[in-house]
Amino acid sequence: MPPKARAGAAVKKVRRKERKNVAHGQAHIKSTFNNTIVSVTDPTGAVISWASAGQVGFKGSRKSTPFAAQLAAEAAARRAMEHGMRKVDVFVKGPGSGRETAIRSLQAVGLEVGQISDVTPQPHNGCRPPKRRRV
């Protein structure tokens, strides 16, 4: 017999994940110096699945490795393929080390990669960059 809800206790509604049928979409890879985030969206930009190096289980400096980017891209692609995704256009942003690895792992999982675009923002002499590291 299930436990009874206490009087005055808040009832938590759980939203069911609806299964979307999207055959073609976009993969946005944001690769920074510290982390890699992969979002798979439908053509309008609504996120279907996402994963990051931190979400896959890496912490600290290991999040910035190409291997962490590979696992993050695989996780996001698998979840997108459950929703019927077959083909993606890839948009890469940022200077990180996981850019190419993430694209390769999207192909390895079984997604057909169409066009690859670099959408890294370029400043027209905007903010002053951080000082050079002296190691």
Curated annotation (Swiss-Prot):
Keyword S-adenosyl-L-methionine appears in the UniProt entry: no
Region (Disordered): 1-22
Low complexity: bias regions: 1-11
Keyword rRNA-binding in annotation: yes
A biological process term (GO) from this entry: translation
GO cellular component, one term: ribosome
Record-level Gene Ontology MF annotations: rRNA binding; structural constituent of ribosome
Annotated InterPro entries: Ribosomal_uS11 (IPR001971), Ribosomal_uS11_bac-type (IPR019981), Ribosomal_uS11_CS (IPR018102), Ribosomal_uS11_sf (IPR036967)
Record Pfam families: Ribosomal_S11
Gene3D superfamilies: Ribosomal protein S11
Secretion signal span: none
Keywords noted in UniProt: Ribonucleoprotein, Ribosomal protein, RNA-binding, rRNA-binding
Function: Located on the platform of the 30S subunit, it bridges several disparate RNA helices of the 16S rRNA. Forms part of the Shine-Dalgarno cleft in the 70S ribosome.
PANTHER family, per database record: 40S RIBOSOMAL PROTEIN S14/30S RIBOSOMAL PROTEIN S11
Assembly and binders: Part of the 30S ribosomal subunit. Interacts with proteins S7 and S18. Binds to IF-3.
Family: Belongs to the universal ribosomal protein uS11 family.
The protein's name in its UniProt record: Small ribosomal subunit protein uS11
Organism the protein comes from: Salinispora tropica (strain ATCC BAA-916 / DSM 44818 / JCM 13857 / NBRC 105044 / CNB-440)
